[in-house]
């Protein structure tokens, strides 16, 4: 499916700034003859021509049942004008699996500190996962919060039945 889309996009007129488009091909000569044979009608042009402008025909679906030769280009054979492949020729599934380009200069500038170079007075700080706050604790587990729900009132009743002096958190 993707290769047939790429084939059709390479056949469009030279409105894209890529060196990948076949410039020797006349898009008006291409017709879908296999579709015309099965449905007993005249061949359908892929492109419509109005006022010397070429438009893609989206009204009728195109079936391509013939073998299609796709010419693949690498970055070494591209002309100087285009920097990389056109967005129409990039397979998103393949390029999503590749890692992004890493600048080697940034990697060389990273200083790796040996353990022997550290001072004896330095120590590693760990982030505390519990940040205590009296207001938040009372808001979530306090007496008023317990009394606002049915389950909370049940907990208060159980704590009183056990003889607890402190009935909330």
Curated annotation (Swiss-Prot):
- Recorded superkingdom: Eukaryota
Q: What is this protein called?
A: Large ribosomal subunit protein bL34m
What S-S linkages are listed for this chain?
none
Q: Does the keyword NAD apply?
A: no
Q: Which Pfam families match?
A: Ribosomal_L34
Q: Does the entry feature the keyword Oxidoreductase, yes or no?
A: no
Gene Ontology biological process terms from the UniProt entry: translation
The GO molecular function terms of this record are:
structural constituent of ribosome
Its chief place of residence is mitochondrion
For this protein, the record's PROSITE patterns field holds: RIBOSOMAL_L34
Gene3D superfamilies the UniProt entry points to: 1.10.287.3980
Task: Note the InterPro entries from the entry.
Answer: Ribosomal_bL34, Ribosomal_bL34_CS
Report the sequence similarity comment from the record: Belongs to the bacterial ribosomal protein bL34 family.
The subcellular location is: Mitochondrion
Question: Which of UniProt's keywords are assigned here?
Answer: Mitochondrion, Ribonucleoprotein, Ribosomal protein, Transit peptide
Q: Which GO terms describe its cellular component?
A: mitochondrial large ribosomal subunit
